[in-house]
UniProtKB/Swiss-Prot annotation:
Gene induction: Up-regulated upon stimulation with lipoteichoic acid.
Name of the protein in its database record: Beta-defensin 131A
InterPro entries noted in UniProt: Beta_defensin_dom
Annotated family: Belongs to the beta-defensin family.
Single GO cellular component term: extracellular space
Bridged cysteine pairs (disulfide): 29-56, 36-50, 40-57
PANTHER family xrefs: BETA-DEFENSIN 131A
Gene: DEFB131A
Signal peptide stretch: 1-22
Protein's cellular compartments: Secreted
Known role: Has antibacterial activity. Upon stimulation with lipoteichoic acid, promotes cytokines and chemokines production and secretion.
Principal location class: secreted
Transmembrane helix is among the record's keywords: no
Tissue expression: Highly expressed in testis. Is moderately expressed in the prostate and small intestine.
Amino acid sequence: MRVLFFVFGVLSLMFTVPPARSFISNDECPSEYYHCRLKCNADEHAIRYCADFSICCKLKIIEIDGQKKW
C-alpha cells in the first residue's frame, strides 16, 4: 500500500510541477543572425535549444584591443 501511495505521489508531483521549457515561448532562433544546427562552428557559441533539439548558434563577438608591441 505504501508503494502505491508513493507511485501516486510521484505521478502527482510530475504533473503539478511546470516543465522546464515553457510551451508559450518561441523555440526558434530569434533573427537571421542566429542559426539552428547540430553543432556550432568554431566562431559561434550556443544560446538555446531549437524545437527539433538542435542548438541555436550565435556568432562570437571578438574584440581586438590592438596589437601588443614588444
